[in-house]
Amino acid sequence: VSEKNHIRKVEKMFTDKPESYRGVYSLLLTPFKEDKSIDYDVYAQYVEWQVERGSHHLFSVCGSSEMTKLTPEERVKCATIAAKYSGDTEVIATANLEPAWHMQVEEVKRME
């Protein structure tokens, strides 16, 4: 997928059906264990908990989730888990933290 296609996809997302972006956006926190590793089991349960409480959209990998402290692999894994456990609830994830544009595009591809 080209860089232009990714940009168009994001632009289309917000102009195509703006009414679909109404509702409650839950900003997902990242649960850490004592050793500072991510507790992915708790994260999956947390995603399900948010959905059960009526969130319309889940924002995984965001400022509230300590995204700047996570590795690219951890960010992708969190977004993947959120997508897996969210059912029909939309998941949004930040994928523009890498310094080089081509690295950002690669992270977006890994999250799709």
What are these regions (language model features)?
Residues 1-12:
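Short, Lys/Arg-enriched N-terminal segments with co-localized hydrophobic residues
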Residues 10-112:
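Active-site beta->alpha loop and helix N-cap motifs at the rims of alpha/beta catalytic domains
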